[in-house]
């Protein structure tokens, strides 16, 4: 099985909250695709609550589009990581890490403005696979933590696992 890009970086050295360019690709038609690692908490040290990350999934996707989409950027998808330490965001375009960090912080401010659970988009049995597994309070706690900490940048060159370490794993 091929070694995926996300497993060539040292998770013990990742800062959080932080943005990292996980991958750049160019489609056969010449479109630039960028995948970002939006690391909410430090791997193996903290984890996002199940209900909080699920509610963020519903809110974050729309708010990030509000703040980042434009003439040269269009978000394709934002999905939570299975390890529950962050989200992956795939988009058309090549925004800077700072642009992404600023949009992320603005999105967290938007999460804090949601007043009631009923305002969470697609919160019903027809559009959500576990529509009862949500917590606006937990999502807002996560948002407050991100705003308080600020968002830094993780660089692949700083996190790259050596061939020696990879060979032992």
From Swiss-Prot:
Role of this protein: Involved in the synthesis of autoinducer 2 (AI-2) which is secreted by bacteria and is used to communicate both the cell density and the metabolic potential of the environment. The regulation of gene expression in response to changes in cell density is called quorum sensing. Catalyzes the transformation of S-ribosylhomocysteine (RHC) to homocysteine (HC) and 4,5-dihydroxy-2,3-pentadione (DPD).
InterPro entries per UniProt: LuxS_sf, Metalloenz_LuxS/M16, S-ribosylhomocysteinase
Cofactor note: Binds 1 Fe cation per subunit.
Gene3D superfamilies according to UniProt: S-ribosylhomocysteinase (LuxS) (3.30.1360.80)
Protein name: S-ribosylhomocysteine lyase
EC id: 4.4.1.21
A Pfam short name: LuxS
Keywords: Autoinducer synthesis, Iron, Lyase, Metal-binding, Quorum sensing
Binding site for Fe cation: 54, 58, 128
Family: Belongs to the LuxS family.
Domain of life: Bacteria
GO term, biological process aspect, one: L-methionine salvage from S-adenosylmethionine
Entry keyword Signal: no
Subunit structure: Homodimer.
Organism name: Shewanella oneidensis (strain ATCC 700550 / JCM 31522 / CIP 106686 / LMG 19005 / NCIMB 14063 / MR-1)
Catalytic activity: S-(5-deoxy-D-ribos-5-yl)-L-homocysteine = (S)-4,5-dihydroxypentane-2,3-dione + L-homocysteine
Names of the cofactor(s): Fe cation
GO molecular function, one term: S-ribosylhomocysteine lyase activity
GO terms for cellular component: cytosol
Enzyme class per UniProt: lyase
Keyword set includes Iron: yes
């Amino acid at each position: 099985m091929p070694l995926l890009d996300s497993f060539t970086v040292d998770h013990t050295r990742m800062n959080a909250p932080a943005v990292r360019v996980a991958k750049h690709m160019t489609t056969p038609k010449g479109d630039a695709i960028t995948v970002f690692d939006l690391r909410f908490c430090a791997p193996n040290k903290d984890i996002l609550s199940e209900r909080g990350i699920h509610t963020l999934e519903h809110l974050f996707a729309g708010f990030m589009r509000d703040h980042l989409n434009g003439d040269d950027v269009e978000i394709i998808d934002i999905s939570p990581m299975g390890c529950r330490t962050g989200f992956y965001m795939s988009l058309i375009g090549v925004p800077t890490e700072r642009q992404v960090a600023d949009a992320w912080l603005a999105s967290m401010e938007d999460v804090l403005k949601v007043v009631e659970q009923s305002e969470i988009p697609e919160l019903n049995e027809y559009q959500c696979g576990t529509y009862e597994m949500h917590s606006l309070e937990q999502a807002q706690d996560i948002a407050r933590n991100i705003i308080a900490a600020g968002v830094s940048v993780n660089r692949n060159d700083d996190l790259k696992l050596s061939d020696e370490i990879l060979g032992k794993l």
